């Protein structure tokens, strides 16, 4: 992708949880962690289990505070040490897709997608049309009035993805969103995600354990070390877009990139 402005910067981030009464301070989960993300970049992050990947995303989403360091969004610091001052999602500037779809069981597919817009007071003819467009883009047309228990796991994941994209946040955090589905469904969800990303090229930070997934989706992959987590390596993904994720193993540059990342993860 071409050069673009830095949208999000993480500067010497550190996180340790408060000690329990009468105990020693907890070890650092994250320490001296720094990276930046460009506007419109698809950044993937891989690392061993327990490397603090979810903790990092929670801090970026302002669900949790950092112990030290700074987060800069679009040139302005959004760092806070006070849990009472947290603003989850930076006032709608950050979307967050987790492993769980968290769909409301009493709302239909369409109503789940529209929920965030309702809460934000942004539900109107234009945003409703955007919701319908995204629903069609991921193959959910005809299932708008189905309830979560009537949907397959993959369809629930697509609904959760569209629910986040519909309010058009400039940054989207994704914490292993496809980890719980079978391989075939996962490949289709990856293809759906790339299709949606290509519609608007929002900045995505995507955490995964799967090196193949990191390569198939990302412009660049960061490797986290074991705790205390830092950036152990950075790998540009030399595979041009558009990509067919079903053919990723056969694409030039995949095998060499996979081996480099695997060596750094280990």
Annotate each predicted stretch with a short phrase:
Residues 61:
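Helix-to-loop junction immediately C-terminal to a conserved catalytic motif
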Residues 76-77, 114, 118, 125-143, ...:
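Conserved ABC ATPase "signature" region
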Residues 107-115:
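Short coil-to-helix segment of the ABC ATPase nucleotide-binding domain corresponding to the Q-loop/switch region
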Residues 146-149, 167:
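Conserved signature/switch motifs of ABC ATPase nucleotide-binding domains
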Residues 24, 78-95, 107, 119, ...:
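ABC ATPase NBD coupling module
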Residues 46-48:
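The feature captures the beta-strand-to-loop junction immediately N-terminal to the Walker
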């Amino acid at each position: 992708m071409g050069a673009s402005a830095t949208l999000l910067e993480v500067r010497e981030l550190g996180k340790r949880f408060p000690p329990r009464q009468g105990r020693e301070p907890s070890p650092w989960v994250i320490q001296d962690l720094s990276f930046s993300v460009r506007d419109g970049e698809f950044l993937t992050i891989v690392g061993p289990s327990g490397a603090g990947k979810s903790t990092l995303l929670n801090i970026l989403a302002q669900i949790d505070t950092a112990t030290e360091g700074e987060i800069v969004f679009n040139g302005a610091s959004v760092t806070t040490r006070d849990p009472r001052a947290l603003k989850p999602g930076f006032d709608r500037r950050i979307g967050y897709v987790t492993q769980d779809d968290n769909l409301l069981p009493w709302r239909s597919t369409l109503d789940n997608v529209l929920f965030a817009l309702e809460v934000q007071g942004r539900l109107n003819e234009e945003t409703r049309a955007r919701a319908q467009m995204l629903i069609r883009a991921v193959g959910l047309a005809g299932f708008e009035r189905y309830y979560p228990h009537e949907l397959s796991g993959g369809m629930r994941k697509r609904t959760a993805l569209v629910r986040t994209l519909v309010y058009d946040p400039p940054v989207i955090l994704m914490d292993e969103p496809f980890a719980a589905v079978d391989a075939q469904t996962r490949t289709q969800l990856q293809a759906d995600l790339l299709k949606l990303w290509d519609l608007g090229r929002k900045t995505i930070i995507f955490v995964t354990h799967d090196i193949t997934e990191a390569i198939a989706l990302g412009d660049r992959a960061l490797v986290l070390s074991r705790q205390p987590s830092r950036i152990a390596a950075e790998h540009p993904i030399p595979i041009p877009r558009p990509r067919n994720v079903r053919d990723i193993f056969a694409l030039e540059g995949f095998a060499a990139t996979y081996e480099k990342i695997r060596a750094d993860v280990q």
